[in-house]
């Protein structure tokens, strides 16, 4: 009986070490899943912001349908249209709308170091009846190094102004 006990000395310690290794691998897996869920949540938040920005400018286009191509031609610079005492025509209001919209996109969406924020564009197709606007919001996912292929996301929404 004593011979049997001598052969088993230290065996329970080996069992504990193996269990500890298995638990460690499991905990690392859980931590990896947690990090991925955080990244997915952040990407989802940016997509939501992009859709909200596109919907906002789509509503502005529908509210000002006579501005026509002014929305697509806007540079994004402030024209001072809404300053006290100024009268704004439809084209000037469109320029101001795009200025505000680009500011919001730059502040709420991530971009590359060169852009400083997300990029937004409005396309205008007057070859179809009624004319069609295409709103595009794009951004780069943060936390990606230059060596990796930085994923770029684009949300495009067609808008019929009438």
Enumerate the language-model features and the residues they cover.
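Aliphatic-rich helix starts adjacent to a transmembrane/signal segment
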Residues: 2-55
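Flexible, low-complexity segments enriched in proline/glycine/serine and punctuated by aromatic residues
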Residues: 39-45, 52-162
